[in-house]
Curated annotation (Swiss-Prot):
One of its GO terms (cellular component) is proton-transporting ATP synthase complex. F(1)F(0) ATP synthase produces ATP from ADP in the presence of a proton or sodium gradient. F-type ATPases consist of two structural domains, F(1) containing the extramembraneous catalytic core and F(0) containing the membrane proton channel, linked together by a central stalk and a peripheral stalk. During catalysis, ATP synthesis in the catalytic domain of F(1) is coupled via a rotary mechanism of the central stalk subunits to proton translocation. The chain crosses the membrane at residues 5-24. Its main location: membrane. It is found in: Cell inner membrane. F-type ATPases have 2 components, F(1) - the catalytic core - and F(0) - the membrane proton channel. F(1) has five subunits: alpha(3), beta(3), gamma(1), delta(1), epsilon(1). F(0) has three main subunits: a(1), b(2) and c(10-14). The alpha and beta chains form an alternating ring which encloses part of the gamma chain. F(1) is attached to F(0) by a central stalk formed by the gamma and epsilon chains, while a peripheral stalk is formed by the delta and b chains. Belongs to the ATPase B chain family. It is a single-pass membrane protein. This is ATP synthase subunit b. Keywords: ATP synthesis, Cell inner membrane, Cell membrane, CF(0), Hydrogen ion transport, Ion transport, Membrane, Transmembrane, Transmembrane helix, Transport. InterPro entries: ATP_synth_b/b'su_bac/chlpt, ATP_synthase_B_chain. GO terms for molecular function: proton-transporting ATP synthase activity, rotational mechanism; proton-transporting ATPase activity, rotational mechanism.
């Protein structure tokens, strides 16, 4: 409180005495200019270095931050390019896998068809052989039956032609 009162008193006296030179007919511009230059020199001496240092540090901080941002941007661009390259490789690999799968499907389909065809041929051949075997068995059985009938009837004498006709009738 005392400081405020002292300041107010000093400022009031300055304003009262400032008019004195003008009232007496003289000017005090030269002493005021010298006082201002001394004040400016002291202010420059005391404040110039901290102000310069502040702005230099600010400039360096901004430059450093800019470099960091540029480095991050460059890194992000490189990562993006790398990700795009990996995506492209993955797409190519997927396309190759699809093509390979299609080719394998075609090959497997052909193999399965060929195997089925061979199995059908084998079954047909087996069936034909089985039919032939059954036919032979039937012919033998019929022949055996006819011969047994003939031998049982010894009294009956047959000629060769009748015998052959009889066998043919039984077989047919």
């Amino acid at each position: 409180m005392k400081q405020k009162l002292l300041m107010l008193l000093l400022l009031g006296s300055v304003s009262l005495f400032a008019n004195e030179a003008a009232a007496s007919g003289g000017t005090d511009i030269i002493p005021r200019t010298v006082n201002f230059l001394i004040f400016a020199a002291i202010l420059y001496y005391l404040a110039a270095e901290p102000i310069k240092r502040f702005f230099q540090e600010r400039k360096e901080g901004i430059a450093k931050r800019l470099e960091e941002v540029e480095a991050k941007l460059k890194e992000a661009k490189e990562e993006k390019a790398q990700a795009e390259a990996e995506l492209k490789k993955a797409k190519e690999l997927a396309q190759e896998i699809v093509e390979t799968a299609k080719q394998e499907i075609e090959i497997l389909t052909k193999e399965i068809k060929e195997q089925a065809k061979q199995e059908i041929e084998m079954l047909e051949k087996s069936f034909e052989e089985s039919m032939e075997l059954e036919k032979r068995k039937r012919v033998r059985a019929i022949t055996k039956e006819v011969l047994e009938e003939l031998f049982e009837e010894k009294a009956l004498e047959l000629e060769k032609e009748k015998f052959v006709n009889l066998i043919v009738k039984k077989v047919a």
